[in-house]
Regions:
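Core catalytic lobe of class I
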Residues: 2-224, 231-234
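Short, conserved SAM-binding/catalytic segment
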Residues: 237-243
């Protein structure tokens, strides 16, 4: 089920029922360009809706870039969990190389009412991707297992899997795009698999050209997408329909 809405996200989100979204995965405006659409959303009003819509253990996954990242994290320290780094394949900022490093990353900021540590009473939904089974399970000290890693080893004290995700994600930059800030489909699919399960509902309240919606459809998730610009909305609608 996909529900696509052409309108102002701060108004349209008011119509979404409380606790109805398993995850919110979105690429909001960073306010770092001169583009008309690149204006930072009123974060206080945004959080008023997101905190109401998200489920108690759901993840809110927002892409960002400095200085917007700092502003975003500071806007809701209570729910902030951690940041991921998306390392791109192409750097930007060549004209400034004599004054500062080229930029080759963006941030992905994770928020939730749920916890993200051993012993959390309400753990945030999280499915680590890319795990590999160890040919020979590793024996863990019983004391260290009970104290720190009881969630990744069996009661017998053996760790059976490895290759747990790190905080830097490497996905190639998008080649030909239909939106200036379009994210790689593979990156969005990775985030969806990490923070949701099949059949669950994802909200993208500034969906742009609809990449998150395409990823959600590919992976059997339900999707709610909101986009203000009518031209990008039509592009998103066509891309999701064709997926």
């Amino acid at each position: 089920m996909n529900k696509l809405i052409n309108g102002d996200c701060l108004e349209e989100m008011k119509n979404i029922p409380d606790g109805s979204c398993d995850a919110i995965i979105c690429d909001p405006p960073y306010g770092t360009t001169a583009c008309k659409w690149d204006s930072i959303i009123d974060l206080e009003l945004m959080w008023e809706q997101l905190k109401r819509i998200i489920k108690p253990n759901g993840a809110i996954v927002l892409t960002a870039s400095q200085p917007f990242t700092t502003t975003l994290v500071a806007s809701n320290m209570k729910m902030f969990k951690y940041c991921l780094i998306w390392e791109k394949s192409k750097a930007t900022g060549f004209f400034h190389v004599k004054y500062r490093p080229q930029k080759i990353h963006e941030d992905i900021v994770i928020f939730s009412f749920g916890g993200c540590a051993v012993g959390s009473k309400n753990p945030m939904s999280y499915n680590p991707c890319g795990l590999l089974k160890l040919n020979t399970p590793k024996k863990r000290n019983k004391k260290s297992v009970s104290a720190t890693i009881s969630n990744i080893v069996k009661p017998s004290g053996f760790q059976e899997k490895t290759n747990y995700p790190k905080s830097i994600l490497k996905f190639g930059s998008v080649g030909k795009t239909v939106h200036p800030t379009q994210k790689p489909l593979e990156l969005m699919e990775y985030l969806i698999k990490t923070y949701t399960n099949e059949g669950e509902t994802i909200l993208d309240f500034t969906m742009g050209s609809g990449t998150t919606g395409v990823a959600a459809k590919n992976l059997g998730r339900r999707f709610i997408g909101i986009e203000l610009d009518p031209d990008y909305f039509k592009i998103a609608e066509d891309r999701i329909d064709a997926a």
